[in-house]
Amino acid sequence: MIQPQTHLNVADNSGARELMCIRILGASNHRYAHIGDVIVAVIKEAVPNMPLERSEVVRAVIVRTCKELKRDNGMIIRYDDNAAVVIDQEGNPKGTRVFGAIARELRQLNFAKIVSLAPEVL
């Protein structure tokens, strides 16, 4: 469960290392974001000499959460960290690589480009 002020790792090579959630997009009364939700975040830590810089406001999609994700078949998936992938206004990733495992639910949410870049889909 991601809420405003939550710090997340970045799971791509866009240049950001750590994000802080400042808003959850989609509905005005969402308190928590789950896997597949789009958030507005600020970059708290960035790699030097990259396009994205510290204190820049970006959009990101949640790809991993520590909170369990329960599937319809009864399977429960839990990750070790909270992570997101930085995206542009059209929903395409800003980076060219995605690190770590990605949930299968992103494919149904029209993030097929992120799923295709991921090394492992759970």
From Swiss-Prot:
InterPro entries: Ribosomal_uL14 (IPR000218), Ribosomal_uL14_bac-type (IPR005745), Ribosomal_uL14_CS (IPR019972), Ribosomal_uL14_sf (IPR036853). Its main location: plastid. SMART domains: Ribosomal_L14. It is found in: Plastid, Chloroplast. Disulfide bonds: none annotated. One of its GO terms (cellular component) is cytosolic large ribosomal subunit. It comes from the Eukaryota. It holds the Pfam family Ribosomal_L14. Gene3D superfamilies: Ribosomal protein L14. One of its GO terms (biological process) is translation. Keywords: Chloroplast, Plastid, Ribonucleoprotein, Ribosomal protein, RNA-binding, rRNA-binding. Belongs to the universal ribosomal protein uL14 family. Part of the 50S ribosomal subunit. Binds to 23S rRNA. NCBIfam families: rplN_bact. This is Large ribosomal subunit protein uL14c. The lineage of its organism: Eukaryota, Viridiplantae, Streptophyta, Embryophyta, Tracheophyta.
